[in-house]
């Protein structure tokens, strides 16, 4: 039974963390890739941080009505972020890769017959 399980070194080689085209990207290029791929997730994160900071501002000013209002906005922006994340996982999915070409052509010839 243990002979069927792959070794840990083989597991790491089979599951890359990024697609091969993204390995050479810098941090700013990866951030740009995320914004282009699904702009609503970073937007939701920025909205959450902004409303949280505004709520803290109003707490320091002792305006508790506005602080509570911005805490409600924070919860709504977190919900927006989670909805955007769920949408991207369910409908957009991972980037598609090209299928590897078969040099022998035997599979293609069998399908044509």
From Swiss-Prot:
PROSITE patterns recorded: HIG1
Region Disordered: start-end pairs: 1-27
Species in which this protein is naturally found: Schizosaccharomyces pombe (strain 972 / ATCC 24843)
GO cellular component, one term: mitochondrion
Predominant place of localization: mitochondrion
Domain named HIG1: residues: 12-103
Highest taxon of source: Eukaryota
GO biological-process terms attached to the record: mitochondrial cytochrome c oxidase assembly; mitochondrial respirasome assembly
Compartmental location: Mitochondrion membrane
Name of the protein: HIG1 domain-containing protein C25B8.07c, mitochondrial
Keyword Transmembrane: yes
Keywords: Membrane, Mitochondrion, Transmembrane, Transmembrane helix
TM spans (from-to): 39-59, 75-95
Membrane topology: Multi-pass membrane protein
């Amino acid at each position: 039974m243990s002979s069927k399980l792959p070794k840990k070194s083989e597991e790491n080689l089979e599951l890359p963390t990024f697609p091969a085209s993204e390995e050479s990207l810098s941090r700013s290029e990866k951030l740009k890739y995320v914004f282009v791929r699904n702009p609503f997730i970073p937007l939701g994160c920025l909205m959450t941080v902004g409303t949280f900071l505004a709520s803290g501002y109003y707490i320091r000013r002792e305006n508790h009505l506005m602080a509570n209002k911005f805490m409600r906005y924070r919860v709504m922006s977190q919900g927006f972020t989670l909805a955007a994340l769920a949408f991207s996982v369910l409908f957009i999915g991972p980037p598609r890769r090209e299928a590897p070409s078969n040099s022998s052509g035997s599979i293609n010839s069998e399908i044509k017959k």
